[in-house]
Each structure stands twice: as C-alpha cells, then as structure tokens.
Regions:
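Glycine-rich active-site loop/strand segments that organize a redox cofactor
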Residues: 39-96, 213-270
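Glycine-rich dinucleotide-binding loop and its adjacent helix/turn
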Residues: 83, 89, 96, 145-204, ...
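Feature captures the FAD/FMN-dependent oxidoreductase FAD-binding
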Residues: 77-153, 280, 287-313, 451, ...
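Extreme N-terminal leader/targeting segments of oxidoreductases
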Residues: 1-10, 28-33, 146-175, 459-468
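N-terminal Rossmann-like FAD-binding beta1-loop-alpha1 element of flavoenzymes
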Residues: 7-36, 184-203
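Short hydrophobic core segments
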Residues: 11-13, 135-150, 184-187, 321-333
Length: 469
C-alpha cells in the first residue's frame, strides 16, 4: 500500500496532556500548521484508560491547556478535599481534552489529527483501523510528547508472578466487584495506592480489612500549599518561603527533611518511618488522617510472588487467602526518568521545567519555541527539572527548578507571559498583590532573603550525595 505524503510545520507525536498543552500554546503564539498523531481513539493520553474514580491530585485551576479553563472556580464543599480548589474527575478531564480538540484545534484549520495510529519514527505512521500508511515531512520540528512514557494500572504488567487461584485485579476493576471479599491487599505505596486505600475507606471498608504493601514510604506535599487562589497566598507562597528558609538553615540532609516537615512543606504517613521515596504526590491533612487509620502497613520490600495462601516479598512472607482481593497499584506513573536537552536540532522533547508540572512545562516550552531564535537561548530558558524518585531527589530537583525561575524572572517578556498563563497558577498571584499589603510583602521578602543561601546549601548537599553514591 502506497503511503500518503503529508507536509506540516510541526509533527507532534502524542495527544496526551503534554502534547495538547504544547499544541495549544503553539496555536496561540504562531500561525504554524500542526499534525498530531496518537494511538488512542481520542485525545487525553493515559486519561483514556484511567481508573473510574481517579481525580487530579492537583487543583484543576492550573491543569489542561492554557487557552481553556478546566476548573469550576469553586472550592470543594464536601469530602476529604473540602475547602480547597476542586479536583476534576478523570471523566471530566477526558471530556475536556476532547472538547479542546473538537472546538479549538480542528476548527482552527491548522491542526490535522490522526487518532488510532501507530507511530514508527522518521515521520511514518499507520492507522490501526484502516491500515493506511502515512509519511509526514515536518518543515520545522518534530515534537516527541510521549517521552515521559506514562503508564497506568490497566495496561501495567506486574513484575511479580501471580498464582492461578489468586483473586487479583488492577485498581480499575474495584468498582466492578459483585461480591464482598474477606479483605483487601493494596500493592503499591504511590499515588495509585493512596487512591485505592481512600476509595475503600470511603466505601465503608473497615481499616482492619485492608493491608497496604508499601515497599517505600514517601514524602508528600500538602495540597493546601498548592492552591492558586489569592485567598491561599499565605499557604502557597508561605510554603515556598518556608522551603527556602529550611534549605538555607539546614545543617545536614537529615536536618533539611526534618525542617521541611516541621514547616509543613512535606508530610509523611508514619512519623516513625523515614521516607525513602518522593514522587511529588499531593495530599490533604484529612486524607492523611484517613490513611493513618490503616494499621496493617507491610514494609517488607517489593512483592515477588503471590500464591493462593501467601505473598512472598523481598523481606519475607505474609499469609493471604483465595477470598482476599489483591489490588495492583504497582505501576509507576512515569517510567522514563532519564533527561535530555529539550531542544536538539529539529527535535523538541518536552520534559518538566518546573517540578511535577508537565502541562505547564509543555506550554512554556512551546512559547519559548515560538518566541526565541537560537537553540542555546531556548535550552537556557528550559532547563530540565528531573522527575524525582528517591527522597533525596527533592534536593537535586530544586537546583534546576530555582535556576529556571531565576532565568524567567530576568526576562520581561516571559514574566509578562507567565503572569497571564492559567497553567502557571502562581506568577499572577504574586504580581497582583497590593504593595501596601505588609503581610504578603513580608512573605515575598523572606523568599528573596533566603533564595541565594538556599541555592548555595543545595549545591553543598548535592556534592555530599555525589560523594556518597
């Protein structure tokens, strides 16, 4: 079958959140023609196969694409997120991206979208439905919006063996239960494991009926400190100031994490257990209190094998039974932790340029692509902030994060753009405070006073980590 030849300015591979945020800003800032290729049947990437009760872990007010609001603008009035900015459900997010494609991208006449297509590289892809083959020539750039390689429970293959008589399911299948199990074993200590435990508790499962296998405890972020509404200025920007002060005053790495916890920047499940993981999960104090009701937290390493009567872990075995549901939450949300320059010749590889903010990062990268000339300048403004995994990655992540913020603050055009980009969430908050508001100005002064000492201390700690590795 002969290939259909297509010519465009930008070929974007992936219509997940990153690809959509990048394309949206490119549409706003340029007159470019865009081709988007994705293997899913509609935009949204992993949201197409997310578990039914998933929600955002961050406020809806700064998720999605820059040109269209996702948030209702209201605070949640019930539930464990009560009093904070609403968290869009998975269904809402999926519908949002679909409407962005149908109501903004395609009507522009500058976007051609090829869903249900397998991309092979070098501009070649095939429709999984019709079998038609296509070859795309990108006049300007290829954009790999799949580089972060998001994985989800429904498509994840566990790294442990499972016996034939084991009642085992991904988190997606929990709402499909038709009979009451004797108990539940939740496998995985990350965001998905948290969601599974909270869902079970919300649906009336007694805490004693839940065992939570947690290979590593995690540091978590208080969601109250991530709100973009000016009413939360003292929490959000105050946490930034407290963070810089904790770094600057820390006498050791252990002391740093103690200070971060004491100041409310970081949270942990059990005060007696030192976390060894940091993935940037956000949580409310109410959610944390709910999770602490679960007393049977298994800290014996990763699961190696599940049989009908026992679970084998790295550190030993625990009993189980055929009437106990084993819920797989062991998939890592993002599996590619390696970094590379974002701008390389005719290839753009979106990665995070602000800690755990991939959609904001994609939007900023697109704006820099549209408004800057040289590759050197583009990469200088878009230093990669590595995705964290270990607890100490919080430290190594902070240096490029602070460097990027410094670079952006010195660029008047970029400062203006940031203050009007809904995905930023925070620049506008800072810019719009009253100069006569002494309380808020004092918080900003704390940040300014601590920034340089904090950067110096971070570099000291990074040197210690490098020597120890």
């Amino acid at each position: 079958m002969a290939s259909t030849k297509i010519s465009t300015d930008y070929l974007i591979v992936g219509s997940g959140a990153v690809g959509m945020a990048f394309a949206d800003t490119l549409l706003t800032d340029t007159d470019a023609d865009i081709v988007i290729v994705d293997r899913h049947h509609k935009p949204g990437g992993h949201w197409n196969v997310a578990y039914p009760f998933v929600t955002l872990h961050q406020p809806s007010s700064f998720y999605g694409v820059s040109s269209r609001e996702l948030s209702t603008g209201k605070l949640d009035e019930i539930g464990l997120n009560k009093g904070l900015g609403s968290l869009a459900s998975g269904a809402t997010v999926s519908a949002y991206f679909d409407s962005v494609m149908r109501e903004r991208f395609l009507p522009s006449g500058r976007v051609r979208y090829f869903p249900m297509s397998e991309y092979y590289g070098e501009g070649r892809f095939t429709s999984l439905v019709s079998g038609k083959e296509f070859e795309v020539t990108a006049r300007l750039k290829h954009v790999d919006a799949t580089y972060l390689k998001t994985t989800v429970p429904s498509t994840h293959i566990p790294r442990f063996s499972i016996g034939d008589d084991v009642w085992f399911m991904p988190i997606n299948d929990l709402p499909k239960l038709t009979s009451t199990p004797e108990g539940f074993v939740v496998i995985g200590g990350g965001k998905t494991g948290i969601d599974a435990c909270l869902w079970l508790l919300e649906n009336g499962v007694e805490p004693d009926a839940i065992r939570w296998i947690m290979p590593r405890d995690a540091w978590m972020i208080d969601r109250r400190n991530t709100q973009s509404d000016i009413a939360f200025f003292n929490d959000t920007i105050g946490a930034q100031a407290a963070q810089f002060e904790a770094i600057a005053n820390a006498t050791s790495i252990d002391d740093l994490f103690e200070r971060l916890e004491d100041s409310g920047v970081l949270l942990r499940l059990d005060p007696a257990v030192k976390p060894r993981m940091f993935h940037g999960a956000t949580i409310t104090q109410a959610e944390l209190n709910e999770l602490r009701r679960i007393q049977s937290v298994i800290r014996m390493g990763r699961v190696e094998k599940i049989e009908a009567d026992q679970i084998t872990l790295e550190g030993g075995t625990i009993p189980t039974g055929p009437n106990i549901v084993h819920v797989d939450c062991s998939a890592s949300a993002i599996t590619n932790l390696h970094t590379k320059p974002i701008f390389q010749g005719d290839l753009i590889t979106p990665q995070t340029v602000r800690s755990y903010q991939p959609v904001f990062s994609a939007s900023l990268i697109a704006h820099v692509e549209a408004t800057r000339e040289t590759e050197q300048e583009k990469n200088q403004l878009c230093g990669v902030v590595p995705l964290p995994n270990l607890d100490t990655d919080w430290i190594t992540m902070m240096i490029p994060f602070m460097m990027n913020q410094y670079q952006w603050s010195r660029d008047p055009e970029l400062r203006e753009w940031l203050s009007h980009n809904r995905l930023d969430g925070f620049s506008g908050m800072v810019r719009n405070i009253d100069k006569n508001d002494e309380e808020k100005q004092a918080i900003l002064q704390r940040m300014r006073d601590s920034a340089m000492p904090a950067m110096a201390k971070l570099q000291t700690f990074v040197s210690e980590l490098e020597k120890a590795s």
